[in-house]
Amino acid sequence: EPTSHLDLPNTIEIMQLLRELAQKTKKAILLSTHELELTLQVADKIWMMTSEKLKTGLPEDLILSGDLQKTFGTERFRFDETTGGFRMNYPANKEVSIQGDKGVSYYWTERALLRNGYKITENSPLWININGDGKWILHLNTHHQEFYTIENLLFTMSEWESKFLSE
C-alpha cells in the first residue's frame, strides 16, 4: 500500500503519478489499497478478492454489475452506485419532503437530513424548498421560515417537531 500513511492530498498525488507513469511507459502497475473511492477514479482495472473468488473488471463495470455493493455493502453502510462513494444507513425516525433545485444544495441537504435521522418522503407535512441560490425554506402547515445554512435549518426543524408535530 504505497499511500497507507499519507494524508489525502499526497495520496491523490501519488495515485495520479502512478497512473501517469503506467500510461507513459505502457506498463501495468499493481498495487494493494484500501482507498476504494479514489481507486475507482484512477484504476483501469480492479481485482477484488472475496472469500469465494476473485472478481476483475473496469471500475464502472464492477459498479454497474452490483459486484462492489455485494462485496462491500453491509447493514450499516452501502456503496452508492450514483456517486461512487459509501453511504451510511442511518436509522430514520422522522420524515421530511424536499422540493426544488436538485443540484449541489439538494445533495448536501439530503445528506445532512439522513445523518440526522430523517427519511425523505414525497408527502410529509414538514417539507423544505431548495431554490438553488443558497436559501432553504422550511414549511409546516401555515408556518414557513427561510434559512441560509443547513445548520440553522436542522436546528429549527428540531424545534418545530417538538413544538408542532408532537402535539
Feature names for model-found ranges:
Residues 11-24:
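Helical segment within the ABC ATPase nucleotide-binding domain
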Residues 7:
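ABC-family nucleotide-binding domains
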Residues 43-58, 73-74, 79:
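H-loop (His-switch) and adjacent beta-strand-loop-beta switch element
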Residues 1-2:
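Walker B catalytic motif
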Residues 33-34:
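H-loop/switch region of ABC-family ATPase nucleotide-binding domains
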Residues 74-167:
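ABC ATPase nucleotide-binding domains
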Residues 39-41:
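A short, surface-exposed alpha-helical micro-motif characterized by mixed small hydrophobic
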